[in-house]
């Protein structure tokens, strides 16, 4: 485990190395969350994640590659490393901050659609309706029904409840009766 991975270490781990035939292509394990994958992320990046949310890698946001790596480190990795715990969401504010900077600088345009998706995920993970609205607008550009379906599902939960009820237990929030009914059959988005 290293507390100071390089930008390339993060990007190569998530998207595979540049010379790999599947570099930058969708990977099923991103969404399926096998325990071995979660453990590998924890082993390789947990110390770096803690440093990242404390600002140690803020300089990464000065480049498109760096911003994407920092978003992954603060948004995607903790959802795997700390699945079903409050710490899964500890990097959300940092990831959202970096995503806003990246959008303002048009960084996502430097990447293929699969990689670009991860610049937008912090908006989909936000419990703010304006962030959700922006996320849906960004995901529309993908012209992919499945991607858009997930974005709308996330937004609809925020419209309905003002938060993600599946986070309530780990965040110490009480559920309303409506949220309890919803959680009986709801998608927990890997959490």
What are these regions (language model features)?
Residues 1-84, 89-191:
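Intrinsically disordered, low-complexity activation-like regions
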């Amino acid at each position: 485990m290293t507390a100071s991975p390089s930008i390339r270490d993060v990007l190569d781990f998530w998207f595979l190395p540049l010379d790999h035939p599947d570099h930058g292509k969708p990977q099923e394990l991103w969404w399926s969350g096998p325990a071995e994958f979660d453990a590998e992320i924890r082993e390789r990046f947990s110390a770096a994640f803690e440093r990242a949310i404390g600002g140690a890698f803020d300089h990464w946001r000065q480049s498109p590659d760096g911003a994407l790596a920092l978003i992954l480190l603060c948004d995607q990795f903790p959802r795997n490393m700390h699945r079903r715990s409050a710490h899964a969401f500890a990097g959300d504010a940092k990831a959202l901050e970096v995503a806003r900077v990246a959008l303002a600088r048009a960084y996502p345009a430097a990447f293929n659609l699969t990689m670009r998706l991860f610049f937008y995920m912090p908006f989909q993970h936000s419990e703010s309706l304006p962030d959700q609205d922006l996320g849906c607008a960004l995901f529309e550009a993908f012209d992919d029904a499945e991607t858009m379906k997930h974005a709308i599902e996330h937004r609809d939960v925020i419209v309905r409840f003002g938060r993600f009820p599946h986070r309530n237990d780990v965040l110490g929030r009480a559920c309303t009766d409506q949220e309890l009914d919803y959680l009986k059959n709801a998608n927990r988005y890997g959490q």
